[in-house]
Curated annotation (Swiss-Prot):
Residues 81-84 are annotated as: G3. Its EC number is 3.6.5.3. Disulfide bonds: none annotated. Residues 174-176 are annotated as: G5. It catalyses: GTP + H2O = GDP + phosphate + H(+). Pfam families: GTP_EFTU, GTP_EFTU_D2, GTP_EFTU_D3. Residues 19-26 are annotated as: G1. Residues 60-64 are annotated as: G2. Mg(2+) binds at T26. This is Elongation factor Tu. GTP binds at residues 19-26, 81-85, 136-139.
């Protein structure tokens, strides 16, 4: 088995397989690594190597995930596959594996099943922007009309969660046949067709440095004769000396000017995504700024108190609660650098939430936070993490 190193010149895309248990997600993942490693180098990972995924701890949550990588003509892909349904739920909500696109695997023999629906809903809630479909196990279906029927069902299901069902690429094949080296249409060619569609359908994500500037404030200092300095790690974009920026969250949005950027005691012209910097703010008093606010490019992000969220509640074994909670529960919501108290409303018909569940809820915070869809947070009680969530929609 050749272990040739990847050239890192190609654009990098994060993807993953989603879909119902036993529809063939892991077999497809193995087939992708086998066929593409033969074409473009990289490492073939067998089914059982992928299936016994190591457990990782992400923000105190135990998630089993397999990471594989492969290359196409155009791109380098990092691909995640999870052994169990609960792992998918946790993975998608915590953002442990942020996906630029997902491959939904549906067994042609069974059609869409409950987790097919649940994974599409999760993808919608957590902001996975693009879904492609691999209609698997086509070798078990003799009737072409049945295939068409399943394809129609999948497209309608995607539509019902606001994905463009009619325009979604659907590739019919058999991951197992492809893995076994079958060269008929449903074998290896179906895998090559799938990656061709991935290259074409999933756009290259915008790099962090090209996005609008945002820096969560971690600390605030007053330097005599210089003014107020805030420190933090630039999450995205670039801030240049002399630019106008906004301070957003916790209170009224304020405008200020960046008059200096400092890193490791050196003065810079700019701070870029990934840098830990101190930013000097003109005319801003120390008491006007606090941890939990963000510095941002003007008008790029707004403060909100009320939102819909998808939340995973830690199980007792993960150090979470031992008892359920109900509507009106008031924990802290930890966004970026700080905790804000909020009250939760459960959906109609949901009495309570048990540890280990995932749930859609409405949250009302007591102070506004700079927020947008896709923002991750932790749910805490007195400093202990009891849940993880993602903002699925801002309300007000």
């Amino acid at each position: 088995m050749s272990k040739s190193k990847f050239e890192r010149k190609k654009p990098h895309i994060n993807v993953g397989t989603i879909g119902h248990v036993d529809h063939g997600k892991t077999t497809l993942t193995a087939a992708l690594t086998r066929i593409l490693s033969e074409q473009y180098g990289g490492e073939f990972r067998a089914y059982d190597q992928i299936d016994n995924a190591p457990e990782e701890r992400e923000r105190g949550i135990t998630i089993a995930t397999s990471h594989v990588e492969y290359e196409t003509e155009e791109r380098h892909y990092a691909h995640v596959d999870c052994p169990g349904h609960a792992d998918y739920v946790k993975n998608m909500i915590t953002g442990a594996a942020q996906m630029d696109g997902a491959v939904l695997v549906v067994s042609a023999a069974d059609g869409p099943m409950p987790q097919t629906r649940e994974h599409i809903l999760l993808a919608r809630q957590v902001g996975v922007p693009f879904i492609l479909v691999y209609l698997n196990k086509a070798d078990m279906v003799d009737d072409p009309e049945l295939l068409e029927l399943v394809e129609m069902e999948v497209r309608e299901l995607l539509d019902s969660y606001q994905f463009p069902g009619d325009d979604t690429p659907i590739v019919v094949g058999s991951a197992l046949k492809a893995l076994e080296g079958d060269t008929s249409e449903i074998g290896i060619p179906s895998i090559l067709k799938l990656v061709e569609q991935m290259d074409a359908y999933i756009p290259e994500p915008q790099r962090a440095v090209d996005q609008p500037f945002l820096m969560p404030i971690e600390d605030v200092f007053s330097i005599s004769g210089r003014g107020t300095v805030v420190t933090g790690r630039v999450e995205r974009g670039i801030v240049k000396v002399g630019e106008e920026i906004e301070i957003v969250g916790m209170r009224e949005t304020q405008k200020t000017i960046c008059t200096g950027v400092e890193m490791f005691r050196k003065l810079l012209d700019e701070g870029r995504a990934g840098d830990n910097v101190g930013v000097l703010l003109r005319g801003t008093k120390r008491e006007d700024v606090e941890r939990g606010q963000v510095l941002a490019k003007p008008k790029s992000i707004t403060p909100h108190t009320k939102f819909y969220a998808e939340v995973y509640v830690l199980s007792k074994d993960e150090g979470g609660r031992h008892t359920p909670f109900f509507t009106g529960y008031r924990p802290q919501f930890y966004f970026r650098t700080t905790d804000v108290t909020g009250a939760i409303d459960l959906p109609d018909g949901v009495e309570m939430v048990m540890p280990g569940d995932n749930i859609q809820m409405t949250v009302s915070l007591i102070a506004p936070i700079a927020m947008e869809e896709g923002l991750r947070f932790a749910v805490r009680e007195g400093g202990r993490t009891v849940g993880a969530g993602v903002v699925s929609k801002v309300i007000e």
